[in-house]
Amino acid sequence: MSERVHKPFLTKELAGIKEAGLYKNERIITTPQKADIKVNAGEEVLNFCANNYLGLSNNQRLIQAAKDAMDSHGFGMSSVRFICGTQDLHKQLEAAISDYFKTEDTILYAACFDANGGLFEPLLTDEDAIISDALNHASIIDGVRLCKAKRYRYANADMADLERCLQEAQAQRHRIIATDGVFSMDGNVAPMDKICELAEKYDALVMVDESHSAGVVGPTGHGVAEQYDVYGRVDIFTGTLGKAFGGAMGGFTTGRKEIIDMLRQRSRPYLFSNSVAPAIVGASLEMFKMLKESDALHTKLMDNVTYFRDKMLAAGFDIKPTQSAICAVMLYDAKLSQDFAAKMQEEGIYVTGFYYPVVPKGQARIRVQLSAGHEREHLDKAIAAFIKVGKELGVIK
């Protein structure tokens, strides 16, 4: 298609996105990622919309470990893993992840999007079935689409609907249940104990994406397997190094050895993407050492979550129930969520409004993400701003 035809087409499409209020503008941050940041022309704000759950994105111990890894192992690998892109650091990190999740083996990816996108196709054929939660992350949805297996979708965390799908899929050779550990828009946790019970009843594998739950959910923050004590009953975990685990980039799949071995042979994002850079691998190894030494960051995070949620509920806000670090402040109206977020930034609080098509129509909200990097004064300032803006816009009295 020539530029003469294609350019007007894209221009019209972009105009439609803007008219619908769905155009995404990127606000520029000029400081390291942490609780207090500067945006645009030096405006100082408190950040309540990062995935920086354990506050490690600017941790000096991790920064030093990254520098040390570059000194000892270089800047980049210039190769995929199976050619000449595997260093001792990569194998050490895979072992550390396996130890953390109590699994047999682990495979690293450039991102969790790649881990999920490259998971199903190597393991399943058109004789098999994938049963996926309706609110799963886009990366799981795309991974399912790339696979020839028959697809079933059950209502979010609805065990009766999951059982219906499992019954319908009994004619298929193999079945796998796919779910997020924490659903990113509502902050609710998948009921893994019940999911595992149904998997055992109907002879299905279980896969869970721990991206928003690892480091956060569970008595010591080890994720949904710890929360529901289902170690050994979940076959596959996927996750990211880009949220609680330091916030850089990189993803992984961890689970049974034969599954991981098959992914090394046939998972296309693994086979055809560069290895994770040594600096990220070295810092991630140090991060897992830190989490072994102490769970103080997790304790602080959950204290912050409880404090913020309780104060917001007392002020009259509608907050979705949560066991995670995600607090969804429900506003329901799309324009209201945009106006609310803009006014919050004027008060020095950086939050984002989410609305259709990211969430269902009539379910607009501000998604607040708490961090161990937040101090009590940060929380109090954010709560005061929510109350002020909430009263101005008629959300609370």
Regions found by a protein language model. Name each.
Residues 80-86, 94-118:
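Short loop-beta-helix segment that forms the pyridoxal 5′-phosphate
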Residues 119-138:
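Conserved PLP-anchoring active-site segment centered on the Schiff-base-forming lysine
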Residues 60, 64-68, 72, 95, ...:
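PLP-dependent enzyme catalytic core of the Aspartate aminotransferase-like
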Residues 299-348, 358, 362-363, 370-372:
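Conserved PLP-binding catalytic core of the aspartate aminotransferase-like
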Residues 11-73, 204:
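N-terminal "arm"/small-domain region of PLP-dependent enzymes with the aminotransferase-like
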Residues 202-205, 212, 217-323, 336:
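Active-site C-terminal subdomain of aminotransferase-like
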Residues 52, 152, 156-208:
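Active-site phosphate-binding strand-loop segment of PLP-dependent enzymes
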